[in-house]
Amino acid sequence: MRKSLKTIDIISLGCSKNLVDSETLMGLMEANGYACTHDSDDPQGEIVVVNTCGFINDAKEESINTILEFAQAKTEGRIEKLFVMGCLSERYLADLEKEIPEVDGWYGKFNYKQLLKDLEGEQFEACEGHRHITTPKHYAYIKISEGCDRHCAYCAIPLITGKHQSRPMEEILDEVRYLVSQGTKEFNVIAQELTYYGVDIDGQQHIAELIDKMAEIEGVEWIRLHYAYPTHFPWDLLSVMRKHNNICKYLDIALQHISDNMLTRMKRHVTKEETYNLIERIRGEVPDIHLRTTLMVGFPGETQEDFDELIAFTKWARFERMGAFAYSEEEGTYSEQHYEDDVPEDVKQQRLDKLMRVQQRISEEIEAEKVNSIQRVIIDRQEGDYYIGRTQYCSPEVDPEVLIPVTDRWLEIGEFYDVLITDSEEFDIYGITIK
């Protein structure tokens, strides 16, 4: 393998699925002689690659502003080349090429590996590389599929990523084995629609089989499941969660709403009654499970009665974790083309604020119940006077963290410790290690 003097800085925007793509590209680049950095505050590389997000308006604006920032850097001679990849360029390529000519190459969601070939010329034969993990090495995201077949009325993701495509199971398991060999202990399994895994291959859901096999791999300490869908939920997955101690009692399942009016208009293909039954059964079959969900307010046609149903459901379900947002139109979606955005912005915000106040009280009560319990905690980092860690119930970056005073004892990053929880807030938990 020849060496290259070129250095590349990859700026990864958006979700964890985008991050996996960035890490895959970095591994490929490094295998072919490039030095790579990731999301540095002051990129020093001759080449910058921006991996964009195009999901919602705020994400689009962030992506465009980032591209323009580096286009200016190129104009000023601070970088040599600028490339763009990801969801935004997948969807708006023609417009972007016209408006930002400073970009040397545009790549979408699936053809970004072509970038290396374009850099090196037609005669260059790329060496395959392993992902370059940019998170702390003890945890990683495992993307098991691309795309989505659900076509919810508000969602632009299928317009960007296309139909659901499951990765081969053995390919996923090989990746897990490799990452274990590199020191990874925690695996956060992600997909646009986790529970659909395998349906595109043979018409059957294989998520339970995949997670069962993943849990059997020696060295896998934690598996956490993200982005399940309520329709046709695979009940055998709950059996697998009970079977293995290294599968976290945690499930991220986006529900969006509860009223039948909203669920129908959103094209969610699930009913209010089915949703209540789903939550009740999950909690019944996996005791102590922590559920994370996402809810939406202000969708076209949402009445006060619809919103009141959502509040009542939230109080009943007592989700341990919740993200919520106000509806905004996304170009090309069913709702943008067929519904009037008729809920006033101030009403959307009022409803969002009320929903989050309700959830805040629930979250505080749930975390307070953990005080005086002993939890297994993995240490992510040290910040000032505290080690920062997480329990099995906490996903990286989005959930509460455990703060342990550095005066308690010396702790190793990436290791597990038994921690006595001494206090809690909505977003922070405090504890001391059990010596």
Residues covered by each model-derived region:
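Extended hydrophobic-aromatic, low-complexity segments
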Residues: 249-250, 263-264, 285-290, 305-307, ...
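Proteins enriched for Cys/Gly/acidic motifs involved in redox and nucleic-acid/cofactor modification
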Residues: 1-197, 251, 273-280, 284, ...
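Glycine-centered loop/turn positions within well-structured domains
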Residues: 113, 150, 195, 260-261, ...
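Conserved, mostly hydrophobic/aromatic
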Residues: 152, 172, 189, 225, ...
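Conserved SAM/AdoMet-binding glycine-rich loop
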Residues: 80-86, 91-92, 96, 181-305, ...
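Short, glycine/charged-enriched secondary-structure capping and boundary segments
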Residues: 24-26, 62-65, 97-100, 120-125, ...
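Active-site proximal loops enriched in glycine and acidic residues that flank catalytic Cys/His/Asp
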Residues: 191, 227, 255-257, 293-297, ...
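Terminal RNA-binding accessory module
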Residues: 337-435
